[in-house]
Amino acid sequence: MVGKNNSNHLPPGFRFHPTDEELIMYYLRNQATSKPCPSSIIPEVDVYKFDPWELPEKTEFGEKEWYFFTPRDRKYPNGVRPNRAAVSGYWKATGTDKGIYSGTKYVGIKKALVFYKGKPPKGIKTDWIMHEYRLSESRTQPTRPNGSMRLDDWVLCRIYKKKNLERAIEMMKVEEDTQEPQIMSVTNPIHEVVASNGQQTLKLPRTCSLSHLLEMDYFGSISQLFDDNNSYNTISQNNTLMTNVNGYVMPHQAMEKFQLGEVSQISMNPSYQFQ
């Protein structure tokens, strides 16, 4: 198992994100042939003697995913079928095995498994996922002090909880989004208002900046706003004076307020209220 000293001597900012090929060529192969690994951060743990939620505390390294070297327990002494039973459930293979290549050479196999609580076949599926890596060769491994083991008796397991990993990815996306400049757009600046008699009139938004006024196509130019020849067409409907501005109708009181009372405020205050 990895000691604290090994973890503490890792360089600042170190992240362990090996590729499938690197896991096979530099870690599992070395472990199976009794050679030292590039870094002693993957402990030897029999993952089938624990439930998956107990495994993170068995290693000093890893936050969202954890790596282990584990002996490949077989269901029958002379058989090849693995025993995947755990303490309170079992690991069930899902999908098809994936071949791992180093260049054009076939070097290993990757298998995906899901943990189920209870006994088969009525176990309850959980969010715990295992990727099991094993070597493709089957030559004899050198004898170890604790006995002889075949090359494929060692597997490398990557274990993680599906929701935790998805949440971490989602948080990374949120952080990226918050760093991008936010642009607010204004749509439909004029709203239809239904009068008491059922007729529709147009209502201006409550707040509007000077730049917004200048950009509104339906207002025309500022000079047109104060041009008596084409701006004032007073009509009387339901005892309400209405003003036609370039074909759009709004209450005469609002237009009068805009023209007479609030013109000076537009240049002083970027936010202007019509009502």
UniProtKB/Swiss-Prot annotation:
Null mutant phenotype: Delayed leaf senescence (including delayed leaf yellowing phenotype under darkness or after ABA treatment) but enhanced fruit yield and sugar content, likely due to prolonged leaf photosynthesis in aging plants; these phenotypes are increased in plants lacking both NAP1 and NAP2.
Keywords per UniProt: Abscisic acid signaling pathway, Activator, DNA-binding, Nucleus, Transcription, Transcription regulation
Induction: Accumulates during age-dependent and dark-induced leaf senescence. Induced by abscisic acid (ABA).
GO biological process, one term: leaf senescence
Sequence ranges assigned to domain NAC in this UniProt record: 10-162
Pfam families: NAM
DNA-binding region listed in the record: 107-168
Gene Ontology cellular-component terms listed: nucleus
Entry-linked InterPro entries: NAC-dom, NAC_dom_sf
Tissue: Expressed in roots, stem, flowers, and leaves.
Subcellular location(s) of the protein: Nucleus
Main location, first listed in the record: nucleus
Domains (record comment): The NAC domain includes a DNA binding domain and a dimerization domain.
Role: Transcription factor that binds DNA motifs 5'-CGT[AG](5N)NACG[ACT][AC][AT][ACG][ACT]-3' and 5'-CACG[ACT][AC][AT][AGT][CT]-3' in target genes promoters. Promotes leaf senescence (developmental, light-induced and ABA-induced senescence) and regulates fruit yield and sugar content, probably by establishing abscisic acid (ABA) homeostasis. Activates the expression of senescence and ABA associated genes including NCED1, ABCG40, CYP707A2, SAG113, SGR1 and PAO, by directly binding to their promoters.
Matches recorded under PANTHER family: NAC DOMAIN-CONTAINING PROTEIN 2, NAC TRANSCRIPTION FACTOR 56
Name by which UniProt lists this protein: NAC domain-containing protein 2
Source species of the chain: Solanum lycopersicum (Tomato)
Source lineage: Eukaryota, Viridiplantae, Streptophyta, Embryophyta, Tracheophyta
